[in-house]
Amino acid sequence: MTSLDAIHRKILGLLQTDGRTTMQELADKVGLSVSPCHRRVKLLEERGVISRYVATVDQKALGLHVSVFISIKLARQKEEDLNRFARAISKWDEVLECYLMTGNRDYLLRVVAADLSSYEAFLKNKLTRLDGIASIESSFALSQVKYSIALPV
């Protein structure tokens, strides 16, 4: 979907804030009746603008008190090595995000763990066992200043 009008953007903003908003509430807030509002939401879903609906869960409530950002440098940057690394880390629940980067690192990962011992186990039993890693640098988050999954619309 290439062009989003003001109503589409308002719908997206509201749904990003509360994905459980009823269609009636959504329609009222964007100034439409329910049917046209529903059609717009369905169109946004069909076009992939709305990719899914999820519940955000507090990581500390699950006992995951440690957030770690890990810079990974591979020994080689060949496509097969990049693909092998991406396949491996995609299977690990501890890895919440992974980005292929430019600059002095190849990958940046965001990982959560219950505590330092759990992170150490992840590091020793998973990450360091992957072939082709030249260096691993871990940075621990002291506190979370801002967190949002809502995109600017």
Predicted regions and their residues:
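A compositional/biophysical signature of low hydrophobicity enriched in polar/charged and small residues
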Residues: 1-153
